[in-house]
From Swiss-Prot:
This is 3-dehydroquinate synthase. It comes from the Bacteria. PANTHER family: 3-DEHYDROQUINATE SYNTHASE, 3-DEHYDROQUINATE SYNTHASE, CHLOROPLASTIC. The gene is aroB. It comes from Rippkaea orientalis (strain PCC 8801 / RF-1) (Cyanothece sp. (strain PCC 8801)). Binds 1 divalent metal cation per subunit. Can use either Co(2+) or Zn(2+).
């Protein structure tokens, strides 16, 4: 059964379609959007090897002319150089303003495809077809697109909304366990910042550390409630002028860890988990929430199979310095998203470097 979640924003609207087992019907879902004939699929070789034929055949069946551009997997390729190569392919196939770029992949592919679509001919159509849990519940929704800069993650980008987010949860069967757990970090985030009932439902599940531990109903619930939480926030604050910043819970320290480890040894979800644990400890030091609540958060992170300790090779002073490049810095002050209870957070710029350092020292993997 398909679930449709409408996203209504001041200047546009689109749907998130959650349709298990229906990747082969993608073309028919695009037909009502009145897109131009040309479609450029952007993916990575591994994902395209799994799902490329299904998607291409579906689009051709609906009368689209289909081209492809493959980018090697990983954050290391999330660069302006990679975007320039997408432009070359778009030019080669003469993509027009009515044409469409489809992101078939995880969060990295989605971010890059959105940025390429936003900037090619000053903006062409863009469709998200996420294949990782992290992309399904977070990265594909809300219109944040971009690439990394050597000094920080996602520093170059644009807000650019897709015409459709098309989610087929059945594609997760090919997702590596580590990537599944990374996606679960974002699901836990929604439980902390917005949806207490989701958090409690995750607590009640027997196991959460691999896809096979979830029945279809629980997986559908996790994806649907997470998508709805993000839509609720984004629909109130599309351009992150206020409320939307809460979606960065765990990301302030998390992004710094990712950047300083070269986007190689620690993936996004793992870094976010480390950041959430740190934020929970900071919230205790500022008397914002209780020891019991941070224990519940940390136990759920552990239940998912995520490591929350910080590598001892990481220079904590460098982490603190790197925070100054965070996108949420305002008037020179680093803004943290801090929990006040399960399901509620605040935005604070009152976190001193001393508090950050003391928390992270205790979080280092001994």
């Amino acid at each position: 059964m398909s679930i449709i979640i409408p996203v209504k924003l001041p200047h546009t609207s689109y749907n998130i379609a959650i349709a298990p087992g229906s990747l082969s019907q993608l073309g028919s879902h695009l037909e009502p959007l009145k897109l131009g004939q040309k479609i450029l699929i952007i993916s990575n070789p591994e994902i395209f090897n799994y799902y490329g034929d299904v998607v291409v055949n579906s689009l051709k069946k609906s009368g689209f002319e289909v081209f492809t551009h493959l980018i090697p997997a990983g954050e290391a390729y999330k660069t302006l150089d990679s975007i320039a190569q997408v432009y070359d392919t778009a030019l080669e196939h003469r993509l027009e303003r009515s044409s469409t770029m489809i992101a078939l992949g995880g969060g990295v592919i989605g971010d890059m495809t959105g940025f390429a679509a936003a900037t090619w001919l000053r903006g062409i159509n863009f469709v998200q077809v996420p294949t990782s849990l992290l992309a399904m519940v977070d990265a594909s929704i809300g219109g944040k697109t971009g690439v990394n800069h050597p000094q920080g993650k996602n520093l170059i980008g644009a807000f650019y909304q897709p015409r459709l987010v098309f989610i087929d949860p059945s594609v997760l069967k090919t997702l590596p366990v580590r990537e599944f757990r990374a996606g679960m970090a974002e699901v836990i985030k929604y439980g902390i910042i917005w949806d207490k009932a989701l958090f409690e439902q995750l607590e009640q599940a027997k196991t959460l550390d691999h896809l096979n531990s979830l029945n279809d109903e629980l997986l559908q619930t996790i994806i649907t409630r997470s998508c709805q939480a993000k839509v609720d926030v984004v629909s109130q604050d599309e351009k992150e002028s206020g409320l939307r910043a809460i979606l960065n819970y765990g990301h302030t320290i998390g992004h710094a860890i990712e950047s300083l480890t070269g986007y190689e040894t620690i993936n996004h979800g793992e870094a976010v988990a480390m950041g959430m644990v740190a934020a929970g400890k900071i919230a205790i030091k500022l008397s914002l929430w209780t020891q019991e609540e941070t224990i519940r958060q940390d136990q759920l992170i552990d239940k998912v199979g995520l490591i929350s300790t910080i590598p001892k090779t990481l220079d904590i002073d460098q982490v603190i310095e790197s925070l100054q490049s965070d996108k949420k810095v305002k008037s020179g002050k680093v803004r943290f998203i801090l929990p006040t209870s399960i399901g509620k957070v605040i935005i604070s710029d009152q976190v001193s470097s001393e508090i950050i350092k003391s928390v992270m020292i205790h979080q280092v993997n001994k």
